[in-house]
């Protein structure tokens, strides 16, 4: 597409407006995991927190790197052996692909395929937090409520993985990277608000996030990610 039109972003560093947004997507997820851990356990400190990452490609790799730097223990699986080998260099511990969803961890971070949260995976899930970068994580809307009833805190995918689109917006608008990071780091604040409203209203976080999005689209009050999203 980029050979036919100038209206394609996020491909490589030779573009006029910049390249791969994956590191910024990962940073937003990292901020979101910290907010999730704080809400669930009372502290945003990731030291010793066990994170099971499903998929260590472009986003999962950068996320794992940040998590390890923050003191977390990272366990990961990927069908691509090259991705696995690169992740091992970071200190990631490898888990079988078929075991990653049910792995005993504090956080399950899906960063690969969509629809990974479904009837079967919810039944086998052993992490009290689901917070990752994959798109369309819920196989159907009902699975958000199923997670809530199981006591699993879910960070809605379109909120926690918004760092990439915020970066793409920066590339197009040609604004500073500092402003971009400031906007991305608001993802944690937005999730904290969603989590609190979910508790107060006894609604699943996915519904609360969608309602906040609708309010923003309609020009009503209600925080959502930051001015770039």
Per-segment meaning from a language model:
Residues 54-57, 61-62, 68-88:
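NAD(P)-binding Rossmann-fold cofactor-contacting core
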Residues 1-42:
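Glycine/serine-rich phosphate-binding loop and adjoining beta1-alpha1 elements at the start
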Residues 48, 79-159:
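Rossmann-like adenosine-cofactor binding region
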Residues 37, 128-229:
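Adenosine-phosphate binding glycine-rich loop
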Residues 42-49:
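Short helix-loop-beta connector
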Residues 1-3, 64-69, 86-89, 165-170:
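Short acidic, glycine/serine/threonine-rich loops at helix termini
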Residues 11-19, 102-107, 124, 162-164, ...:
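Short, basic, helix/turn surface patches
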């Amino acid at each position: 597409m980029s050979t036919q039109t100038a209206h394609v972003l996020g491909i490589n560093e030779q573009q006029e407006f910049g390249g791969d947004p994956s590191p910024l997507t990962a940073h937003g997820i990292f901020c979101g995991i910290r907010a999730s851990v704080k809400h669930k356990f009372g502290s945003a400190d990731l030291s010793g927190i066990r994170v099971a990452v499903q998929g260590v490609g472009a986003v999962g790799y950068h996320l794992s790197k940040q998590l390890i730097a923050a003191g977390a223990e990272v366990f990961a699986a990927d069908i691509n052996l090259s991705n696995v080998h690169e992740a091992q260099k970071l200190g990631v511990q490898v888990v079988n692909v078929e075991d990653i969803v049910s792995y005993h961890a504090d956080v399950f971070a899906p960063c690969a395929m969509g629809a990974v949260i479904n009837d079967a995976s919810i039944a086998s899930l052993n992490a009290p937090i689901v917070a990752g970068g994959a798109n369309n994580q819920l196989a159907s809307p009902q699975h958000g409520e199923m997670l809530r009833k199981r006591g699993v805190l879910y960070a809605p995918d379109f909120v926690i993985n918004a760092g990439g689109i915020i970066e793409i917006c920066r590339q197009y608008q040609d604004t500073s990277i500092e402003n971009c990071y400031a906007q991305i780091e608001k993802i944690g604040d937005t999730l904290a608000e969603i989590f609190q409203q979910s508790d107060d209203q006894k609604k699943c976080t996915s519904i609360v996030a969608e309602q906040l999005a609708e309010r923003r689209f309609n020009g009503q009050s209600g925080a959502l990610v930051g001015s770039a999203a």
